[in-house]
Amino acid sequence: MRKRHVCRLLACVLLVTALLGTAPAAASAAFADVPAGSWAEASINRCVQSGLFQGETATRFGMGRPMTRAAFTVVLCRFFGWELIKPEQPTYTDVRDPARWYYSAVETACAHGAITRQTENFRPNDPITREEMAVMLVRALGYTTLAGQAQELELPFADVTTNKGYIAMAYEMGIINGTSAATFSPERTATREQAAVMLMRLYDKVHCPAPKLVGIAAEQTGEWNGYDAVAVTGGRLSYAVNQALVTRPEQRREENLISSIHAGGAKALLQVSGNTTALKGKTSALASALDAAMKEGGYDGLYLSFDNLAENRAAALTALVKAVNELLPADKLLYVEVKAPAWNGGAGKAYAYGDLASAADCLVLQIEPYQLWDGKLMAAPMEPVEEVYYALSALNNSVPAEKLCLQLTTTASIWQGSKSSGSADAAELQALLEAEKVRTYYSERYQCAYVQQTGVNPVRVAWYLNEEAVRARVQLCGLFGVERICLGGRSAVSEAILAGITK
């Protein structure tokens, strides 16, 4: 009965898009109680045009009137495009009559996890509170588990004591605002126009265009249709004897890759890696060497990646990025790969994200992985979804979303027992999936796929991103306004990964 949240969002987009495209336009003048120019006028019009809302009468919307729990549940089912159900056995003691206009919506929302069975009563005629609305929206998006983890994070609202994770997520994703800088007013009832505004905010986020693709070109050749920018690997920055040096990829490989990238309509970036030692060099010399290497190779910009950046070198990296930005022509791009902020601190503490973003065109976020061994199964999800949420939330107020890019691991992580057996590209993973004595799974906890092969001892496990897992991460990016996804080498990018991004 319960559908996965990514399918819900797809249904939402298809339903609302169709409605918005075919419904006759309704002017706010149709409702005498909606003042022209009101802060909620546009959202009210869109909700009515799409069929999500109806006026209380032909001429009155019900501006300022509270939204009941039953009415909001009906609207929620319409928004997500859920197929209504009408079970013979009711879930709640106060929603027992199948003939009631909200009976099917309440049962459907319960089946999809938007509301729970924790109490016997649903209270359909009670005004919905701001807290209840936030909880229902976040649960409808499929983030119940994530909200449980998010309750550990700080909130600016002193008056929130329950459901902190749900309210934090709704607030951080820009679905619902506080009533002041320090208050959320969780018990305050929500009005019909407030519900309309929140739903249209959410609609705009889930209906955003597919993210732009950034690629990493490690192969000799490849097709790059549909990519926005592609980084050519092989560049290295070093500094010795008071001299900065940038080595470029082998010439024939470089020329072939740039040609194929341009043929696909993408920008070709020179990826230059380095370490903490390189950053000890003179900033102006390092920046000049990077600028010269980019121009000599005929690239459209630079993609900088520094390994194991020490916290005490953060200022040096920031200074270098600013110096490079000053040298680059206006039509050249500057991407910087960084470790993302992590729940436990980690390597992300070494970066001044706001300063880097002010000089670079894009920060490519690498999410730190983790492994959990329970004695039977190694859990090693790719780009753990709670870490993706934490990173985007942590950068929400310091880095513009349009300057962020989430990097996804395109290879599979192979484990035998508690020991790593390396990685597998798309072809190798497909061979494993087609092998004997294998079973595939999808972890709702990690929102990541894995396969177990039981014909070997110890059991072999491979964690990987399938279409559903990719959609879960792309969905989070969309909710935060992040417009780019970075993928690894073309040979490791499966059709399932591309489908999760583009469909």
Segments from the language model and where they lie:
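Active-site groove signature of glycoside hydrolases
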Residues: 287-316, 362-374, 486
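Glycan-binding loop/region signatures in secreted carbohydrate-active enzymes
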Residues: 403-473
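Glycan-recognition patch characteristic of GH18 chitinases/ENGases
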Residues: 209-289
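Conserved, mostly hydrophobic/aromatic
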Residues: 230, 304, 363, 406, ...
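Bacterial N-terminal signal peptides
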Residues: 11-21
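Substrate-binding surface in catalytic domains of secreted glycosidases
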Residues: 239-252, 311-433
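Extracellular low-complexity, Gly/Ser/Thr-rich intrinsically disordered linkers
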Residues: 453-503
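Feature responds to low-complexity, polar/acidic, surface-exposed segments characteristic
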Residues: 2, 19-41, 49, 54-103, ...
